[in-house]
């Protein structure tokens, strides 16, 4: 890989870095070198994640080398002094021992992001770098990593956690018991980077718990990947053995970091939660006194006593009474109190700083007990105890010596609990009246006469979480995202010292992006999605007409983002009633973002499939939804994005009101906090920036950004857009009439298709071991084509003749449809995820494979005559109608067969040649089922080495292929490998294949052209 010296550090990058990437890596290295913090913005598609990983790990590797040199010198000094030569020699020996044990002076990297999907993407980026052999680990939840069949049957993450803890504590989990003996197994400690799916696969193979095994890797890892909550939650850090001293913290996708910090310090408790906890304690006490304990909990001695339960019940009853006594002046919106109210409520029930840890430990023991008891009787599994434990942990995490800051940063908001939530409350009251006797005040708590309440303990100062992070003596904190601007207010809110700032421009040229504000629709109706106008049928109709006209012009994928789900649903209903929906569907099939995970995954796959049709597709989604936050719509998947409105938070929401009030109260000239209104506007604009970032994904990408809300003309609103977008709008952005925009948009795409490089195979890309997408058994994959409506320019007509097409040609790796399917964890078959899915990036979706043609795809006749031996034909699609659907189900692949190609000696009767599966996943599964494990491992190794690009590697690959696949019954797989080779090696491959046929077949064999 090319090496560049950046800020004095040699950095290996998969290709020659662009200037924006150099600038970014320089800032990262300076932060690490000086032990300072940085806030770095670089637009989506500029290679931010790749630059971040390469720069940080290059610096770590340099420090490791320096450390090794220091240890060698120290060892040499110790030898010169001789054994027992005095205090100096002993000190050197001690220092050397400590240095070896603690990797003395070499920091480690913690890479945190919002979701595991984003972490998987980062790990895939790391796999294609020169630092792929550095020690890494990813931390996941039990829900993702547990392989115990009984635990996985549990509904809800908390139940899985508690049952897992129970089995580990009782030493009845065989998977966890094998961790100690299997943790040094080569498959687990090997050099390859393992993501969540890889950990599960190895765990299943070794019958070892992936969850607990991953923790064994943390201490020795150079880089640890984890979600935000593992890092920001002190309890999670302790549970996962995460030490932050002398650590580099990288917070990627940090545009939501303020909210995440606030939410991690906030908590809620309901009256019904307390009532059900009382009922659960009462039930356990009844079991104790009735002699049922052995039947319910087994013969093991309990970790708690009847006195413990009595005391806890008294405390819970007092807490319930205290909550009931809180006055709610406004039953509709609730009443706000100072933060001190929470401490007063807990104090009345004798929950204090002094006994918090003891009570939390008791609650955890009770949860374990109920998990066992639930195996023998119908009973709740202690969810309310978990809620109480979280409440005490979060509230008392704020030390007594900072209570003045707590009172400024927190508020208590009390709401009336809905009546349908009070069933548990009334049930608890009955339980108290009929349950364990001896406490005369049980029936006098007054719960029946008081309205149940929700007590919210809300944090409005994100600096609280960041301050706790800095207090752990971390070396550096780097916050980065594509949409951090404006940086000053962000830094002010987080209250951390920042030495390095960066707002990178985009990597694309101005001519590759078309940005316009559309203030009126085709009928000159104002487009403004404010509260007053959202129910205006004229506005909704005009917006639909706008989308229809844009859909007629934009090729391939069109994304439409709405401010909220209610607005999306309102527009869909209106357009379906008026016929606009059908009109848009005639131009492009429409997909709507669903909320369910399974539906979402299948909808995305259908959308990506529809893009392969010449008409493309429309995807309607919501700002801040799943589509806007993590998916890649590069190249044809997204040629334009329409923003239909600004997604402001609900103005009357109590939390929004209190956040604005907090900013206004604490804002000074010195701290540069935003005003309440500025924060309100910025929250909406950042969501817009994220949605816009789905489209332009790499240097050769192009697309249009259409802001269909007249409020985007406001200077204050424009200033909060990303810097690279502002450059396209000018100093005084104004909306243009709809007619000229349509003409300009048509001209933009015509020019882009004529001048821009269309997606092609990326030769230098390194193989990735992605989890393969498993397709449904029995369905025929639609062979994609790149064809356009009649009248489009020659670029697409020429592209349609190509033998191999791919969807993405980014020099900067980003999400693809296959990546999305694996990140979502969706597998339709039962095959385990395959770490050897090294083919997933060697090419992409194939539209036409001619195994016999080595001529140019651009030649007039296609380069192959009628004597072609094996050809898989494209199926042209004209419309998504019923006829097409039937064709999809019934049309089989057609093959041209030559009489002199045989898989094995047969009679003279015509036989159809077996063809390698088209899907990479199916190809790998079939290959693995036919060869030994050692052969498959050798096959994977040489294929990975082949990607380094030398002819020697090609020879090694051919040697293994001929050894493994040369037999007549395996010949179809040998031929199928051709599509995964680089173009310069295909001719030689054809020669080898022809020679193989001549040597093993008795009949003459024509060389494949």
UniProtKB/Swiss-Prot annotation:
Residues the entry annotates as binding ATP: 42-49
InterPro entries linked to this entry: ATP-dep_Helicase_C (IPR006555), DinG/Rad3-like (IPR045028), Helic_SF1/SF2_ATP-bd_DinG/Rad3 (IPR014013), Helicase-like_DEXD_c2 (IPR006554), HHD_RTEL1 (IPR049909), P-loop_NTPase (IPR027417), RAD3-like_helicase_DEAD (IPR010614), Rad3/Chl1-like (IPR013020)
Gene Ontology CC: one annotated term: nucleus
GO BP term, pick one: DNA recombination
Keywords: 4Fe-4S, ATP-binding, DNA damage, DNA repair, DNA-binding, Helicase, Hydrolase, Iron, Iron-sulfur, Isomerase, Metal-binding, Nucleotide-binding, Nucleus
Predominant location: nucleus
Domain Helicase ATP-binding: 7-322
Top-level taxon of the source organism: Eukaryota
EC number: 5.6.2.-
GO MF assignments: 4 iron, 4 sulfur cluster binding; ATP binding; ATP hydrolysis activity; DNA binding; DNA helicase activity; DNA polymerase binding; metal ion binding
UniProt-annotated location(s): Nucleus
Sequence motif DEAH box, location on chain: 252-255
Catalytic activity entry: ATP + H2O = ADP + phosphate + H(+)
Binding, [4Fe-4S] cluster: 146, 164, 173, 209
CDD domains listed in its UniProt record: DEAHc_FancJ, HN_RTEL1, SF2_C_XPD
Pfam families: ARCH_RTEL1 (PF23109), DEAD_2 (PF06733), Helicase_C_2 (PF13307)
Task of the protein: A probable ATP-dependent DNA helicase implicated in DNA repair and the maintenance of genomic stability. Acts as an anti-recombinase to counteract toxic recombination and limit crossover during meiosis. Regulates meiotic recombination and crossover homeostasis by physically dissociating strand invasion events and thereby promotes noncrossover repair by meiotic synthesis dependent strand annealing (SDSA) as well as disassembly of D loop recombination intermediates.
HAMAP family xrefs: RTEL1
Family: Belongs to the helicase family. RAD3/XPD subfamily.
Protein name (database record): Regulator of telomere elongation helicase 1 homolog
Organism of this sequence: Drosophila pseudoobscura pseudoobscura
